[in-house]
Amino acid sequence: MLKVYFLALFLAGCSAFVLDEIRGINIGQSPQKVLVDHVNTVQTSWVAEHNEISEFEMKFKVMDVKFAEPLEKDSDVASELFVRGEIVPEPLPDTFDAREKWPDCNTIKLIRNQATCGSCWAFGAAEVISDRVCIQSNGTQQPVISVEDILSCCGTTCGYGCKGGYSIEALRFWASSGAVTGGDYGGHGCMPYSFAPCTKNCPESTTPSCKTTCQSSYKTEEYKKDKHYGASAYKVTTTKSVTEIQTEIYHYGPVEASYKVYEDFYHYKSGVYHYTSGKLVGGHAVKIIGWGVENGVDYWLIANSWGTSFGEKGFFKIRRGTNECQIEGNVVAGIAKLGTHSETYEDDGGAATSCSFIMCTLMVLTYYFV
């Protein structure tokens, strides 16, 4: 009888433990399939789908969670654009997609792949830079900015390479030191990404060393001449203001946002994500390209850097207006310094676009004064 009593206590304890695990305290070694089934059972805002990538491999796609927090020295720095008063308040649309407003800017549509390096902070920066150069130049300049250059050469000012980094510092690096061109692994440009996409038995990637030469097949420019510079880098909002973030995107293009990642996010397939269950895994940085409403839920439209097999062909939606996973608390952007001499850039498809002296000058004047 005593054995039966202790067995009952043991089973009750196990049941309580499993329930606590599923509720989000910590799913520990429980199968990820259990988590996916739980997510799909308790809510209908988004759909989770079990994937075959192990937790061990997936953890390398995020960074140290501290990099998702704003730098303390920037906590009271308002957006330079709002301080200058360049944005005139106006009604914003209920839905917006930067791909539709600037259809000639191919990089806005591009989904890149960071592989097993926590370089999301550098990806987000490179993507925003690429998009904004195109937007400011009215589509005549379309560089695919190198993640590798930012990742390997920004150093400890930005963070710890594949372990994570600060998005704002990546943009400041672009403004002070410039960034060359370069697509994903095996791509075009001066300095493409070192790491190939991987989906099974993937080793952890280590931060590549900083190089100051272009790949041998790139004959267009030397490293220093291939540099693209920013005119400014700034925080978009210090108050988690949804309207300020929307206004920035609507007028100037995509922005970079850092946020906290939980286990359930790895299994996102579609819908409007919000944290449901699972432990905190780390931080992540992504590119916000728009917003909208789905089934009555406000969302941000976001480009991830985990390849096109993730989510909605590489994109995802996350709840807007509630600072979900702190995504509205650390949003940054920058303004490009367009060249005023004849420049030719290689995009990731190898197509070149050019800008004449007169055309570039007119574009700069139009962008800032019209």
UniProtKB/Swiss-Prot annotation:
One of its GO terms (cellular component) is extracellular space. It is an enzyme of class 3 (hydrolase). Disulfide bonds join 105-134, 117-162, 153-210, 154-158, 190-214, 198-202. Its EC number is 3.4.22.-. The active site is at 120, 284, 304. SMART domains: Pept_C1. InterPro entries: Papain-like_cys_pep_sf (IPR038765), Pept_asp_AS (IPR025661), Pept_cys_AS (IPR000169), Pept_his_AS (IPR025660), Peptidase_C1A (IPR013128), Peptidase_C1A_C (IPR000668). It comes from the Eukaryota. GO terms for biological process: innate immune response; proteolysis involved in protein catabolic process. The keyword Disulfide bond applies. Residues 17-91 form a propeptide. Residues 1-16 form the signal peptide. Glycans are attached at residue 138. GO terms for molecular function: cysteine-type endopeptidase activity. Keywords: Disulfide bond, Glycoprotein, Hydrolase, Protease, Signal, Thiol protease, Zymogen. Belongs to the peptidase C1 family. This is Cathepsin B-like cysteine proteinase 3. The gene is cpr-3.
